[in-house]
A protein has these predicted regions:
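Conserved HGGG/HGGXW glycine-rich cap/lid loop of the alpha/beta-hydrolase fold
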Residues: 73, 80-128
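Short beta-strand/loop motif that positions the catalytic acidic residue
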Residues: 277, 283-285
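Flexible "cap/lid" loop of the alpha/beta hydrolase fold
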Residues: 174, 183-213
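Conserved alpha/beta-hydrolase catalytic His-Asp/Glu region
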Residues: 194-199, 212-275
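Active-site loop/oxyanion-hole signature of alpha/beta-hydrolase fold enzymes
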Residues: 67-71, 78-84, 113, 123-160, ...
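Alpha/beta-hydrolase fold catalytic core
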Residues: 5, 15-16, 22-89, 113-116, ...
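Acidic catalytic loop of the alpha/beta-hydrolase fold
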Residues: 288-292
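Catalytic active-site module of serine/aspartate enzymes centered on a nucleophile-bearing elbow/loop
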Residues: 306-337
């Protein structure tokens, strides 16, 4: 490991973005996090399609046809050209489990202004892509991303993966090292082998739990991303959309897909991939993404040869929303280095 490159950088800075004011109607509290009583869905909550036809994306969405396990499916993606002078390089942004390409809007704009072509897929099973009931694996997601880059005529790109997308990015870098010009693992999950920590849960049990998901459960699941335990106003739309899926007539199929993906995260660890990654790597994330994240993130950086670690203080799971100035500064510094 090169001593000059491999170092942990702890950044100081303010937490950007205002947090939500107290929502008395739903029982939320900004002072002490979310109230103990179950939260009630706001009056304006409505059904959302799990394939997000009713959610505007920041750039045109295209579709790549694929055949997977006998299913003819479509993989949605955005292919956004540079806004200024092109630098001839491309960046792929891989979303997390609770998200889809749309939430990368601000990141796309920053990268394209810096001269990058930006490719943003919705993995099959997410966003505007098809949602077949089939096996889901990280290797398949990496292969689908590889197929997309091949179709777009790209021989390599910088791969940026957030949350579950960090697991996909890890597997992509392992399987396609020649195509991984750089690797950014951004608040990735899967930092341990969960199979060694808890017994498996049957898929049907996970499915039944998801079928009965409430607004309170959706809110609290996303509130964990923020150190205050409160979802900011700017992020509330993701709570309403995810809850809105449960009101859709298509929720039973979408819930099964989510159950299968959750099983994938448990059954398909990436911890054994890190030592074999050859790409120049940045491990970056908010240091308040759970009590163990700084230690586990350092372990990742120590295991990937030559990796660099950047921890952003006071920030949780979504720094490009919570602390955009620092996050984008560090991302561009790494991509340009």
């Amino acid at each position: 490991m090169t001593g000059g490159w491999h170092r942990a950088v702890l950044l100081s800075g303010l937490l950007f973005g205002s947090l939500a004011a107290s929502r008395a109607a739903s029982g939320q509290s900004t002072a002490g996090g979310v109230a103990a009583t179950p939260l009630v869905a706001p009056a304006d909550a409505k059904a959302f399609s799990p394939t997000l036809e009713d959610v505007p994306y920041p750039y045109p969405v295209h579709f790549l046809p694929l055949t997977l396990y006998g299913h003819e499916v479509r993989m949605a993606y955005m292919d956004v050209p540079p806004a200024g002078a092109a630098n001839g390089r491309a960046v792929v942004l891989l979303h997390g489990m609770n998200f889809y390409g749309e939430y990368w809007a601000s990141t796309i704009d920053v990268l394209r202004q810096a001269g990058f072509r930006v490719i943003v897929p919705d993995q099959v099973g997410f966003g505007r892509s098809s949602k077949p009931i089939m096996p889901y694996t990280l290797s398949d997601m990496a292969a689908n991303t590889h197929a997309l880059l091949h179709t777009l005529g790209l021989s390599n790109a910088a791969i940026v993966g957030h949350s579950m997308g960090g697991m996909v990015a890890t597997r992509f870098a392992l399987l396609y090292p020649g195509e991984t010009e750089r690797l950014v693992l951004y608040n990735q999950i899967g930092l341990t082998d969960a199979r060694l920590q808890r017994p498996p849960t049957p898929t049907d049990q996970v499915y039944k739990q998801l079928l009965g998901e409430t607004y309170d459960q959706v809110y609290r699941g996303l509130a964990r991303y923020f150190p205050t335990g409160v979802v900011p106003d700017s992020f509330q739309k993701y709570v309403l959309r995810q809850y809105g899926w449960t009101l859709s007539g298509n929720w039973p199929q979408a819930a099964m897909v989510r159950a299968l993906v959750q099983q994938m995260v448990y059954e398909d660890p990436v911890v054994y991939d890190w030592a074999h990654i050859k790409s120049k790597t940045l491990e970056i994330g908010g240091d308040k993404d759970g009590p163990d994240f700084p230690t586990l993130a350092k372990h990742v950086a120590d295991t990937i040869p030559g990796a660099r670690l950047v921890l952003i203080p006071g920030v949780g799971h979504v720094p490009h929303v919570q602390s955009p100035d620092i996050f984008f500064r560090e991302l561009l510094k790494f991509l340009r280095s």
